[in-house]
Protein backbone atom coordinates (compact mmCIF):
# COMPACT_ATOMS: atom_id res chain seq x y z
CA UNK A 1 0.00 0.00 0.00
CA UNK A 2 1.44 3.33 -1.10
CA UNK A 3 2.05 5.88 1.62
CA UNK A 4 0.32 9.25 1.44
CA UNK A 5 2.49 12.19 2.44
CA UNK A 6 1.92 15.95 2.26
CA UNK A 7 4.17 18.75 1.08
CA UNK A 8 2.93 20.74 4.10
CA UNK A 9 1.41 18.92 7.06
CA UNK A 10 -1.47 20.63 8.87
CA UNK A 11 -0.19 21.41 12.36
CA UNK A 12 -3.74 21.25 13.73
CA UNK A 13 -3.89 17.54 12.85
CA UNK A 14 -0.89 16.70 15.06
CA UNK A 15 -2.83 17.04 18.34
CA UNK A 16 -4.96 13.94 17.75
CA UNK A 17 -2.07 11.67 16.75
CA UNK A 18 -0.68 8.96 19.07
CA UNK A 19 2.44 10.03 20.97
CA UNK A 20 5.79 8.54 19.96
CA UNK A 21 8.05 7.29 22.76
CA UNK A 22 11.54 5.87 22.53
CA UNK A 23 11.19 2.19 23.50
CA UNK A 24 14.84 1.38 24.21
CA UNK A 25 17.52 1.84 26.87
CA UNK A 26 18.51 5.33 28.00
CA UNK A 27 21.98 5.73 29.52
CA UNK A 28 23.01 9.02 31.12
CA UNK A 29 26.72 9.89 30.89
CA UNK A 30 27.87 12.17 33.71
CA UNK A 31 31.66 11.79 33.87
CA UNK A 32 34.58 11.99 31.46
CA UNK A 33 35.56 8.41 32.29
CA UNK A 34 32.22 7.07 31.03
CA UNK A 35 32.48 8.74 27.64
CA UNK A 36 35.16 6.44 26.18
CA UNK A 37 33.14 3.21 26.46
CA UNK A 38 29.97 4.95 25.36
CA UNK A 39 31.61 6.31 22.21
CA UNK A 40 33.18 2.93 21.40
CA UNK A 41 29.72 1.35 21.66
CA UNK A 42 28.09 4.01 19.49
CA UNK A 43 30.72 3.84 16.75
CA UNK A 44 30.12 0.09 16.43
CA UNK A 45 26.66 0.93 15.04
CA UNK A 46 25.91 1.44 11.34
CA UNK A 47 23.79 4.57 11.91
CA UNK A 48 23.16 7.06 14.72
CA UNK A 49 20.56 9.70 15.49
CA UNK A 50 21.78 12.92 17.11
CA UNK A 51 20.36 15.99 18.81
CA UNK A 52 21.28 18.54 21.48
CA UNK A 53 19.50 20.43 24.24
CA UNK A 54 20.37 23.80 25.75
CA UNK A 55 18.99 25.48 28.84
CA UNK A 56 16.47 28.07 27.61
CA UNK A 57 17.21 31.77 28.05
CA UNK A 58 14.40 33.97 29.32
CA UNK A 59 16.30 37.25 29.67
CA UNK A 60 17.87 39.50 27.05
CA UNK A 61 21.59 38.87 26.68
CA UNK A 62 21.45 35.59 28.60
CA UNK A 63 23.21 32.76 26.77
CA UNK A 64 23.85 29.17 27.75
CA UNK A 65 26.15 26.54 26.27
CA UNK A 66 24.86 23.19 25.00
CA UNK A 67 23.99 21.13 28.08
CA UNK A 68 23.11 17.77 26.52
CA UNK A 69 24.23 15.76 23.51
CA UNK A 70 21.98 12.80 22.81
CA UNK A 71 23.20 10.05 20.47
CA UNK A 72 21.03 7.04 19.71
CA UNK A 73 21.34 3.69 17.99
CA UNK A 74 18.15 1.88 16.98
CA UNK A 75 17.68 0.61 20.54
CA UNK A 76 19.97 2.50 22.93
CA UNK A 77 20.35 6.22 23.53
CA UNK A 78 23.23 7.84 25.39
CA UNK A 79 22.66 11.24 26.98
CA UNK A 80 26.00 13.04 27.34
CA UNK A 81 25.62 15.76 29.97
CA UNK A 82 28.07 18.24 28.51
CA UNK A 83 27.52 20.71 31.35
CA UNK A 84 29.25 18.09 33.54
CA UNK A 85 31.75 16.48 31.13
CA UNK A 86 32.50 19.14 28.55
CA UNK A 87 33.56 17.82 25.15
CA UNK A 88 36.00 15.09 26.14
CA UNK A 89 38.53 13.54 23.71
CA UNK A 90 36.11 10.62 23.23
CA UNK A 91 33.16 12.90 22.43
CA UNK A 92 35.35 14.87 20.03
CA UNK A 93 36.28 11.56 18.36
CA UNK A 94 32.58 10.80 17.95
CA UNK A 95 31.82 14.22 16.48
CA UNK A 96 34.74 13.99 14.04
CA UNK A 97 34.10 10.37 12.98
CA UNK A 98 33.69 9.92 9.22
CA UNK A 99 32.67 6.24 9.11
CA UNK A 100 29.24 6.12 10.78
CA UNK A 101 26.29 8.13 9.44
CA UNK A 102 24.89 10.49 12.07
CA UNK A 103 21.42 11.84 11.35
CA UNK A 104 20.11 15.08 12.82
CA UNK A 105 17.67 17.87 12.09
CA UNK A 106 18.73 21.51 11.82
CA UNK A 107 22.09 20.00 12.70
CA UNK A 108 24.06 22.87 11.19
CA UNK A 109 22.85 25.02 14.11
CA UNK A 110 23.71 22.31 16.65
CA UNK A 111 27.25 22.10 15.28
CA UNK A 112 27.71 25.85 15.70
CA UNK A 113 26.58 25.58 19.33
CA UNK A 114 28.78 22.55 20.03
CA UNK A 115 31.81 24.31 18.57
CA UNK A 116 31.31 27.11 21.10
CA UNK A 117 32.19 24.51 23.73
CA UNK A 118 35.21 23.23 21.81
CA UNK A 119 36.43 23.48 18.24
CA UNK A 120 36.26 20.31 16.16
CA UNK A 121 36.00 19.23 12.52
CA UNK A 122 32.50 17.81 11.91
CA UNK A 123 32.50 14.23 10.61
CA UNK A 124 29.80 12.35 8.69
CA UNK A 125 26.53 14.11 9.50
CA UNK A 126 23.33 14.15 7.45
CA UNK A 127 20.74 16.85 8.12
CA UNK A 128 17.16 15.72 7.45
CA UNK A 129 16.32 19.25 6.32
CA UNK A 130 18.70 18.73 3.40
CA UNK A 131 16.98 15.57 2.11
CA UNK A 132 13.22 15.83 2.77
CA UNK A 133 12.78 17.93 -0.35
CA UNK A 134 13.74 14.90 -2.43
CA UNK A 135 10.27 13.44 -1.76
CA UNK A 136 8.44 16.78 -2.00
CA UNK A 137 8.11 17.65 1.69
CA UNK A 138 8.53 21.34 2.49
CA UNK A 139 8.14 21.18 6.28
CA UNK A 140 11.34 21.42 8.30
CA UNK A 141 10.35 20.80 11.95
CA UNK A 142 10.89 17.37 13.49
CA UNK A 143 7.36 17.26 14.88
CA UNK A 144 5.74 17.98 11.51
CA UNK A 145 8.03 15.62 9.62
CA UNK A 146 7.34 12.70 11.93
CA UNK A 147 3.59 13.32 11.90
CA UNK A 148 3.67 13.50 8.11
CA UNK A 149 5.76 10.39 7.47
CA UNK A 150 4.65 8.13 10.34
CA UNK A 151 1.37 9.56 11.68
CA UNK A 152 2.73 9.92 15.22
CA UNK A 153 3.26 12.94 17.46
CA UNK A 154 6.55 13.90 19.08
CA UNK A 155 5.70 15.76 22.28
CA UNK A 156 7.58 19.03 22.78
CA UNK A 157 6.48 19.72 26.37
CA UNK A 158 9.97 19.25 27.83
CA UNK A 159 11.81 21.47 25.35
CA UNK A 160 11.93 24.56 27.56
CA UNK A 161 12.84 22.79 30.79
CA UNK A 162 16.16 23.25 32.61
CA UNK A 163 18.67 20.96 30.90
CA UNK A 164 21.38 21.90 33.42
CA UNK A 165 19.43 20.58 36.42
CA UNK A 166 21.45 18.22 38.63
CA UNK A 167 19.34 15.14 37.82
CA UNK A 168 17.27 14.89 34.63
CA UNK A 169 13.76 13.60 35.27
CA UNK A 170 12.27 10.67 33.36
CA UNK A 171 10.20 12.93 31.09
CA UNK A 172 13.29 14.92 30.09
CA UNK A 173 15.24 11.74 29.37
CA UNK A 174 12.41 10.26 27.32
CA UNK A 175 12.01 13.50 25.34
CA UNK A 176 15.73 13.77 24.61
CA UNK A 177 16.08 10.13 23.55
CA UNK A 178 12.97 10.25 21.35
CA UNK A 179 14.25 13.26 19.42
CA UNK A 180 17.57 11.60 18.57
CA UNK A 181 16.14 8.14 17.83
CA UNK A 182 13.35 9.49 15.62
CA UNK A 183 15.96 10.94 13.25
CA UNK A 184 17.09 7.41 12.35
CA UNK A 185 13.52 6.35 11.59
CA UNK A 186 12.90 9.39 9.42
CA UNK A 187 16.14 9.04 7.48
CA UNK A 188 15.59 5.38 6.66
CA UNK A 189 11.97 5.91 5.62
CA UNK A 190 12.75 8.99 3.51
CA UNK A 191 15.49 7.03 1.75
CA UNK A 192 13.13 4.08 1.18
CA UNK A 193 10.44 6.32 -0.29
CA UNK A 194 12.95 8.17 -2.43
CA UNK A 195 14.37 4.96 -3.89
CA UNK A 196 11.07 3.10 -4.39
CA UNK A 197 8.72 5.97 -5.20
CA UNK A 198 6.19 4.10 -3.06
CA UNK A 199 4.18 7.16 -2.04
CA UNK A 200 1.53 9.63 -3.14
CA UNK A 201 2.36 13.29 -2.55
CA UNK A 202 -0.58 15.54 -1.71
CA UNK A 203 0.27 19.14 -2.57
CA UNK A 204 -1.58 21.91 -0.80
CA UNK A 205 -1.75 24.92 -3.08
CA UNK A 206 -3.80 28.03 -2.32
CA UNK A 207 -6.31 26.06 -0.31
CA UNK A 208 -6.59 23.23 -2.85
CA UNK A 209 -5.15 19.76 -2.60
CA UNK A 210 -3.66 18.22 -5.72
CA UNK A 211 -2.68 14.55 -5.63
CA UNK A 212 0.55 13.74 -7.44
CA UNK A 213 1.27 10.13 -8.44
Predicted regions and their residues:
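N-terminal accessory regions of nucleic-acid-interacting proteins
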Residues: 1-48, 117, 128, 181, ...
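Conserved DEDDh/DEDDy metal-dependent 3′-5′ exonuclease domain
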Residues: 23-30, 34-36, 43-47, 56-156, ...
Amino acid sequence: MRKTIYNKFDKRAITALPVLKFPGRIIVIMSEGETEKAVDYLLSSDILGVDTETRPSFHRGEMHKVALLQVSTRDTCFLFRLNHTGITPAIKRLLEDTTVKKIGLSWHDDILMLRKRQEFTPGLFIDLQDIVGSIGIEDRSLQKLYANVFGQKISKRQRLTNWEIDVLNDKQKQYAATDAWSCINLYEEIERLRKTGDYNLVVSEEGREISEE
